[in-house]
């Protein structure tokens, strides 16, 4: 398999608890798993066939493992194949496999876990993980994400004390255990997917944006073109993008005022991991409920949160390229332009990874920077801005 670059409505009724192997190994437990954050990704320890490894927690995806690592841990291909789309809507057919004796924490023990067999993905290697762990691994338990202590609390078979079934938001049915539920803006609901694999607060598809724009609950702030990021299948074809200001939304009684999000076609509408800064998220998978317990009940104003640069840079085709460009630079910078320096620092010898780019921009304290572009045989500087 070739290397890939990465970086990555009906409601359920009350469901009976599933009878699984786990129910015969533990009647009731509460467990705590410490996690780490790397470049906005939640990374958790997992044991497969008594071998330690790490996965990205991705509540919006299905469990997927670099097959080279899976084989080392005793993984076996099933002979089945599955067509799976990445974050950009680009689809490919992957082989399916089984991982033996998967242990998450001290008590969540799965005799086997189905996984998508992935090629060698450099971005995963850079993060020190073997893949992504989806909701399918937690389908029989209640999971709470507590960002204040960087812990995952696993409850089986009941929810944490104080959380009532009727207080939760019902989840839409999902064969892949995605966490989908309605989120309301000015009285109009759109279906969102809670996805810990996306660091941002919100992204939105074009259809949902148009629905909210009709009731004046969404206003375009900036226009751009490009891609929101690299998925398992690499960069998507450039598309029209928007940065949009939304009306407030409420979760768990907490108001989020003036949120912004990026809008593109062919992407899901996502509530990302940034929401964990503001409260505890609990997912009751067996009963299909989503809970949000805010750390503070006071409203939060997001009007100045998460500014973005007027270009984004990603590794592609053996070099660092412009992946996204926003107004007013659309007529001066082309998608695919090679970037050879940032603030005069040569980046052509850096490892071709998104992490290398992130490290450079994380060190910039001002809201302005200069990039050097090489277009054919010509080099020129462009000032870019964070806003």
Short names for language-model regions:
Residues 1-26:
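Bacterial Sec-dependent N-terminal signal peptides
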Residues 21-387:
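Pepsin/retropepsin-fold aspartyl endopeptidases
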């Amino acid at each position: 398999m070739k290397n890939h670059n990465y970086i990555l409505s009906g409601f359920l009724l009350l469901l009976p608890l599933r009878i699984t192997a786990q129910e015969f190994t533990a009647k009731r437990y509460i467990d705590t798993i410490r996690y780490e954050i790397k470049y906005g990704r939640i990374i958790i320890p997992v044991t497969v066939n008594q071998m330690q490894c790490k996965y990205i927690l991705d509540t919006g995806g299905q469990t997927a493992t670099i097959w080279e690592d899976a084989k080392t841990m005793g993984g076996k291909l099933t002979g089945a194949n599955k067509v799976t789309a990445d974050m950009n809507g680009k689809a490919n057919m992957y082989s399916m496999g089984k991982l033996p004796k998967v242990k998450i924490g001290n008590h969540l023990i799965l005799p086997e876990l189905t996984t998508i067999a992935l090629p060698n993905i450099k971005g995963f290697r850079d993060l020190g993980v073997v893949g992504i762990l989806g909701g399918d691994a937690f389908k029989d338990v209640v999971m709470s994400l507590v960002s204040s202590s960087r812990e995952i609390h696993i409850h089986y078979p009941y929810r944490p004390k104080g959380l009532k079934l009727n207080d939760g938001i019902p989840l839409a049915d999902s064969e892949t255990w995605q966490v989908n539920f309605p989120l309301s803006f000015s009285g109009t609901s759109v279906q969102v997917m809670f996805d810990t694999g996306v660091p941002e607060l919100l992204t939105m598809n074009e259809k949902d944006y148009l629905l909210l724009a009709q009731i004046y609950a969404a206003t375009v702030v900036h226009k751009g073109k490009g891609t929101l990021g690299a998925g398992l299948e690499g960069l998507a074809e450039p598309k029209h993008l928007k940065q949009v200001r939304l009306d407030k939304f409420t979760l768990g009684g907490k108001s989020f005022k003036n949120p912004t999000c990026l809008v593109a076609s062919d992407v899901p509408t996502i509530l990302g991991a940034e929401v964990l800064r503001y409260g505890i998220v609990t997912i009751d998978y067996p009963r299909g409920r989503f809970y949000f317990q805010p750390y503070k009940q006071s409203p939060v104003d997001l009007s100045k949160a998460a500014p973005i640069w007027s270009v984004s840079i990603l590794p592609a085709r053996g070099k660092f390229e412009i992946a996204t460009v926003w107004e007013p630079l659309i007529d001066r910078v082309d998608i695919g332009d090679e970037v050879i320096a940032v603030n005069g620092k040569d980046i052509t010898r850096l490892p071709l990874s998104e992490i290398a780019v992130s490290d450079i921009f994380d060190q910039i304290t001002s809201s302005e920077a200069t990039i050097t572009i090489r277009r054919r045989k010509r080099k020129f500087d462009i000032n870019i801005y964070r806003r």
